[in-house]
Amino acid sequence: MTTCQPLPKLWLLSDERNDAVLEQAIARLPRRSAFVYRHYHLDMAKRQARFAALRDLARRHDHTVILAGSPVLARKWLADGVYGPASAMPRDNALLKIVTAHNWPEIVAAERAEADAIMLSPVFPTASHPGGRSLGPVRFRLLARKTAIPVIALGGMTKDTAKRLDWPRWAAIDGLS
């Protein structure tokens, strides 16, 4: 997507476990950050209502608002972009396309989908996948530097791990909540 604004450096992802504090977390983010609404646990009507309220709050703080879901839904719900695997991305560039990736083949798929950014995870051990294997800082950097597309670090990210990773863009669920 062509945009006048640079890609945000800080990204907050919603989840069932941070729902109760999202309003405060969104308000605390620096202006022109990004908010990715997931909330897969809600039925469609409740998901849309919660999205609308959080979208409006995020916009009051000049945040970019991304919907995890179909491009059709992202347009209908007035999101700035769509989040998900490369296979779910729209062919046009009307929405900001944030593609999830965990390895090199998924990064290549993101390039083919003409992603605006790749959310590469998990960098560190994470509550989302307890006991799961993480990339670690070295492997994360090796993968991230192989693509020209901006990469957003996700997974176990907090202010401390972001400082340790020393990467320009990062995202968190619990680490920003």
Name each model-derived stretch:
Residues 6-22, 96-100:
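Active-site mouth loops of central-metabolism enzymes
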Residues 12, 35, 74, 110, ...:
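Conserved, mostly hydrophobic/aromatic
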Residues 12, 82-93, 117-131, 154-177:
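Glycine-rich phosphate-binding active-site loops on the catalytic face of alpha/beta enzymes
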Residues 15-28, 70-72, 103-109, 158-161:
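Short, acidic/polar
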Residues 24-31, 56-60, 75, 111-114:
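Acidic (Asp/Glu)-rich catalytic clusters
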Residues 34-95:
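N-terminal active-site wall of soluble small-molecule enzyme domains
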Residues 48-64, 89, 93-104, 133-158:
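Alpha-helix-loop-beta-strand connector modules within alpha/beta enzyme cores
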